[in-house]
């Protein structure tokens, strides 16, 4: 059998390279991974990208890009529609296509290719079920062929590779050996001898054969997978389609689809296959997959030799990898972090396989004659072999000899293929060498020119080198000087260490004192607790004493209640006497009420009569006056408005005749007329106001009458007070007399006020008159000013305005007459108001005489009543004296009981005072010193820290010891010229690491010595610089002490140290 379809291309075809399509599918976590708490470290971040992490919290990620990536939630139908569905059309067009699943064991390869469900006749390649790619592809092919309505045949085969042994899963004879041979007619293809291809006609036939193959396939249970595939399988589908050619000749189109399910790579320890046959299976599986990886690497690197023959698996897939087949790879991986190494290996191989290029070619369409001829030749060949075997007249060889010839032939073919590949590789290498030679020739010319430039630069560099050597010598000397400085600092550090130990000893002593102080505080706390308990006990005793005092108070309260009842009885008796007195008083009150009612009735009648007459006269006079005045005002207003309208009409006629000349005059004249109207209207309003003021002036008369009525009401109130205050009748009578005299005085005062109000009204009338005269004057002045203005305008204007001036003069005369008329009417109104007030004054005099008569009569009656009531009050006083004597006795008894109770309470308080003294003297504890509390002391420790001498002094002495007279002893080690800067920087880089570290110690000015900063070795200043201490506010700090030990604080007043010694100053 030919795995590639067994057809050769006899016509030249257009070849185009095509990369292998690579897909990745990530399965979800299974139950085993959930049990071992394996975390997901693989993420599908896009339709084409996969990101992996070594651990869940790792920030280092690796991203792979493929043609398509499927996440854990992807379905079987999604994978098929993307990967295999496009290949079905290519198969029907006559291409050979291959799809194989690659990955670690237990990642879902068999699930993807075969599925977990058994395919049924009603199953469709588009439904959402767990059937795999193989049954979906067969169903899809049958559906497409049925819709094409062509004649076709379909044959399938199911090949298994187990422990490098081939097996036909659909064959009924297990003894048949299957071999692989290279196809001499088609380079890169193999022929599988002994593999049975079974024709199928429906989906049912295919599903039955597929189930048969699944049952015969080698599977086993491992720790990684309950049904782990222990072999590789290749499911091949060959489709022959009959179609008519251009000349009407029958043509046969052949397409082939290989669906490969590879066994997964395994780790022996993880899978639990350390013993037995499983070890051999694992070794063979891993060996074949390793060879597949090497083939992929060789194809990607375009190596001259691809190791197809090192494994039967790679020989089966030879045409699919780098051949004439359209190939797709599905890489299945696990998302758990326990399998991250295998996952990364699978992703890297799959990512590398993307670069493999195939050259897909359409299988040649064969005519019916060609097919029959091939079949006839093959039948004749088989017949001859059969006859030779029967007749035994052919060439017979020993089995060993035949085996040697076969092996020799295979080795020669293998060697020939290798030589051909080697020759091709040598040719490619020769082309590369020629290309390199041309490039080298071109670069040689460029290098020659560069060499000349380099020689010139060399001469310049030699001069620079001499200068650099000098700088290097100086730099080495400076290095030694810095080394000497470091040694001085080390000596200082040793002294500082000794001082630090002394300070730590003082700190330990202070710590011990602190612990003893804490013990003292604890003892005082315990003493406070005892005092608190004593206070609680004292509180309980005092509470008992207070309860006893409360009991005595309750007893005293009961005694007071009994006395209260006795006093209540006496009060009842007194109330009986009071009731009798009240009865007598009520009779007297009734008599007084009758007398007061009579007096009140007389006063009320008199008051009503007076009010009626006054109001009648006032209403008649006011109404007549207002009506007359309003009628006159309305008549005058109508007359004035008519006259003004007439004058305006005349003026308007004149203006129409002289419109062009009198526009400005018309506006001014209209303004004057409007002001006149406004003054007339304001005058009318003021007249209304004056009338209202006159009406308001009549109101005081009504208010005086109202006051009289209120005085009568006061009389009634006084009578009621007499009824309520019979217990002090005599005093009330005197008060009534006084009030009546006051009322008489107030009535006379009110009459005087009425007289004053009359005079005030007369004055107001005079003011109104003067106001009217003022308005008259204002009107005359306004008219005169208007006349003067109009006269000036007329003189400056046209003669046609003479008539308007005449009208204005008539209006002025009319206004004067109107003012005189208003003055006359106002005088008449003033006279009528005076008559009205005279009448009111007469009525008030009569009312006053009548009120005095009523008052005299009331006084006589009251004197009679007072005498009778005084006799009754004397009798009741004697009865009250008897009741008061009894009440006095009861009060004395109450005082005696109170004295006894007070004595008892005094005794209880003495007991409480004794308890308090006992608590203070015996129970209340005080603190007793133990003698362990530390006393105040002075801690002795170094208060002045050592410091290193100035760097200039150290360097100067060091130079004198070494007798370096060639250097300037007055210069510091940091000086360098500007011209040496660049060279010194290169020289410093050539020093050792120790030298570079030493150069990081800068020199700071000390004791007024100025240190010059250059640009060489003092560029890196850091916090380790030695600085002199500064005494500010009694505190000193040292940079050296900060870098070596914690900072120290000197007490106030400690002297600042001065550096003046050679090496160290204490």
Curated annotation (Swiss-Prot):
One Gene Ontology CC term in the entry: microtubule associated complex
Outcome, altering residue 207 to F: Spindle defects and greatly reduced phosphorylation by Wee1 in vitro
Disordered: region residues: 990-1009, 1016-1066
GO terms for MF: ATP binding; cytoskeletal motor activity; microtubule binding; plus-end-directed microtubule motor activity
Subcellular location: Cytoplasm, Cytoskeleton, Spindle; Cytoplasm, Cytoskeleton, Spindle pole; Cytoplasm
Coiled-coil residues: 362-462, 540-569, 639-738, 808-875, 889-918
PTM description: Phosphorylation is required for localization to mitotic spindles. Phosphorylation of Thr-933 during mitosis controls association with the spindle apparatus. Phosphorylated in vitro by Wee1.
Start-end of Polar residues biased regions: 990-1002
Keyword Acyltransferase appears in the UniProt entry: no
Domain Kinesin motor: 19-356
PTM annotation (Phosphoserine): residues: 949, 1043, 1050, 1054
A GO biological process held by the record: mitotic spindle assembly
Residues spanning the membrane: none
Keyword terms, alphabetized: ATP-binding, Cell cycle, Cell division, Coiled coil, Cytoplasm, Cytoskeleton, Microtubule, Mitosis, Motor protein, Nucleotide-binding, Phosphoprotein
Binding site for ATP: 103-110
Family label: Belongs to the TRAFAC class myosin-kinesin ATPase superfamily. Kinesin family. BimC subfamily.
Stated name of the protein: Kinesin-like protein Klp61F
Lineage of the organism: Eukaryota, Metazoa, Ecdysozoa, Arthropoda, Hexapoda
């Amino acid at each position: 059998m030919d795995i590639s379809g067994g057809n050769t291309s006899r016509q030249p075809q257009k070849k185009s390279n095509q990369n292998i399509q690579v897909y990745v599918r990530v399965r979800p976590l299974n139950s085993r991974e959930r049990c071992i708490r394996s975390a997901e470290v693989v993420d599908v971040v896009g339709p084409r990208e996969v990101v992996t992490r070594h651990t869940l919290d790792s920030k280092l990620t690796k991203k792979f890009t493929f043609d398509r990536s499927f996440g854990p939630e992807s379905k079987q139908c999604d994978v098929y529609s993307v990967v295999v569905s496009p290949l079905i059309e290519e198969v029907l067009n006559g291409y050979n296509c291959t799809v194989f699943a690659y990955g670690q064991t237990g990642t879902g390869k068999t699930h993807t290719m075969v599925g977990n469900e058994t395919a049924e006749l009603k199953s469709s390649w588009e439904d959402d079920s767990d059937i795999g790619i193989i049954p979906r592809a067969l169903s899809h092919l049958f559906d497409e062929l049925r819709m094409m309505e062509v004649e076709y045949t379909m044959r399938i085969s199911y090949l298994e590779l187990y422990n490098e042994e081939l097996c036909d899963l659909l064959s009924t004879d297990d003894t048949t050996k299957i071999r692989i041979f290279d196809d001499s007619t088609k380079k890169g293809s193999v022929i599988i001898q002994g593999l049975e291809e079974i024709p199928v006609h429906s989906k049912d036939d295919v599903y039955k054969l597929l189930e048969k193959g699944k049952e015969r396939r080698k599977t086993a249970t491992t720790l990684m997978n309950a049904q782990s595939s222990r072999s590789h399988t290749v499911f091949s589908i060959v489709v022959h389609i009959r179609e008519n050619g251009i000349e009407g000749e029958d043509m046969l189109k052949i397409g082939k689809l290989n669906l490969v399910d590879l066994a997964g790579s395994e780790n022996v320890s993880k899978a639990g296959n350390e013993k037995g046959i499983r070890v051999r299976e694992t070794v063979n599986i891993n060996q074949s997959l390793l060879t597949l990886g090497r083939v992929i690497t060789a194809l990607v690197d375009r190596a001259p030799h691809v190791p197809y023959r090192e494994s039967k698996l790679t020989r089966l897939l030879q045409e699919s990898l780098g051949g004439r087949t359209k190939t797709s790879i599905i890489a299945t991986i696990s998302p758990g972090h326990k399998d991250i190494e295998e996952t990364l290996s699978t992703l890297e191989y799959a990512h590398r396989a993307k670069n493999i290029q195939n050259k897909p070619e359409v299988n040649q369409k064969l005519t019916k004659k060609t097919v029959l001829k091939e079949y006839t030749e093959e039948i004749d060949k088989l017949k001859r072999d059969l006859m030779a075997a029967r007749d035994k007249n052919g060439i017979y060889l020993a089995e060993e000899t035949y085996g040697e010839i076969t092996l020799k032939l295979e080795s020669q073919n293998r060697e020939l293929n290798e030589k051909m590949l080697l020759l091709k590789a040598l040719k490619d290498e020769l082309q590369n060498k020629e290309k390199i030679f041309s490039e080298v020739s071109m670069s040689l010319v460029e290098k020659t020119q560069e060499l000349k430039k380099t020689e010139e630069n060399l001469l310049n560099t030699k001069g620079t080198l001499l200068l650099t050597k000098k700088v290097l010598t100086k730099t080495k000397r400076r290095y030694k000087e810095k080394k000497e400085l470091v040694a001085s600092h080390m000596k200082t550090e040793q002294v500082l260490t000794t001082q630090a130990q002394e300070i730590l000893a003082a700190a330990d002593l202070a710590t011990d004192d602190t612990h003893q102080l804490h013990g003292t505080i604890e003892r005082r706390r315990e003493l406070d607790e005892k005092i608190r308990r004593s206070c609680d006990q004292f509180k309980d005793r005092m509470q008992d004493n207070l309860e006893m005092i409360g009991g005595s108070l309750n007893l005293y309260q009961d005694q007071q209640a009994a006395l209260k009842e006795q006093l209540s009885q006496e009060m009842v008796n007194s109330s009986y006497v009071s009731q009798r007195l009240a009865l007598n008083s009520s009779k007297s009150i009734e008599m007084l009420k009758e007398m007061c009612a009579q007096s009140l009735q007389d006063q009320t009648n008199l008051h009503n009569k007076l009010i009626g007459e006054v109001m009648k006269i006032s209403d008649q006079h006011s109404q007549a006056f207002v009506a007359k005045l309003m009628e006159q005002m309305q008549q005058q207003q109508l007359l004035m408005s008519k006259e003004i309208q007439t004058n305006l009409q005349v003026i308007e006629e004149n203006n129409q005749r002289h419109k062009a000349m009198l526009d400005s005059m018309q506006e001014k004249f209209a303004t004057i007329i409007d002001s006149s109207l406004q003054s007339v209207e304001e005058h009318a309003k003021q007249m209304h106001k004056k009338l209202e003021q006159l009406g308001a002036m009549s109101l005081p008369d009504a208010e005086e009458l109202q006051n009289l009525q209120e005085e009568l009401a006061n009389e009634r109130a006084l009578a009621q007070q007499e009824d309520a205050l019979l217990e002090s009748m005599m005093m009330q009578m005197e008060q009534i007399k006084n009030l009546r005299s006051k009322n008489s005085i107030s009535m006379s005062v009110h009459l005087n006020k009425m007289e004053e109000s009359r005079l005030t009204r007369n004055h107001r009338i005079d003011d109104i008159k003067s106001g009217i005269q003022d308005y008259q004057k204002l009107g005359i002045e306004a008219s005169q000013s208007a006349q003067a203005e109009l006269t000036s305008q007329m003189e400056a204007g046209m003669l046609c305005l003479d008539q308007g001036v005449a009208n204005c003069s008539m209006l002025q005369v009319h206004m004067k007459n109107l003012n005189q008329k208003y003055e006359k009417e106002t005088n008449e109104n003033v006279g009528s108001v005076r008559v009205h007030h005279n009448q009111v004054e007469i009525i008030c005099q009569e009312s006053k005489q009548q009120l005095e008569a009523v008052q005299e009569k009331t006084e006589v009656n009251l004197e009679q009543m007072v005498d009778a009531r005084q006799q009754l009050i004397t009798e009741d006083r004697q009865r009250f004296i008897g009741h008061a004597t009894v009440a006095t006795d009861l009060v004395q008894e109450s005082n005696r009981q109170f004295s006894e109770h007070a004595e008892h309470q005094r005794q209880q308080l003495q007991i409480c005072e004794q308890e308090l003294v006992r608590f203070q003297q015996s129970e209340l504890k005080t603190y007793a010193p133990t003698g362990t509390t530390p006393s105040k002391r002075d801690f002795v420790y170094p208060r002045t820290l050592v410091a290193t001498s100035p760097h200039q002094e150290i360097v100067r002495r060091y130079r004198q010891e070494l007798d370096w007279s060639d250097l300037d002893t007055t210069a510091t080690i940091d000086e360098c010229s500007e011209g040496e800067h660049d060279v010194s920087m290169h020289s410093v880089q050539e020093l050792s690491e120790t030298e570079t570290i030493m150069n990081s110690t800068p020199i700071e000015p000390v004791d007024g010595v100025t240190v010059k900063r250059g640009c060489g070795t003092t560029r890196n200043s850091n916090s380790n610089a030695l600085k002199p201490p500064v005494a500010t506010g009694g505190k000193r700090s040292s940079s050296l002490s900060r870098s070596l030990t914690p900072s120290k604080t000197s007490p106030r007043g400690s002297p600042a140290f001065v550096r003046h010694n050679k090496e160290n100053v204490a």
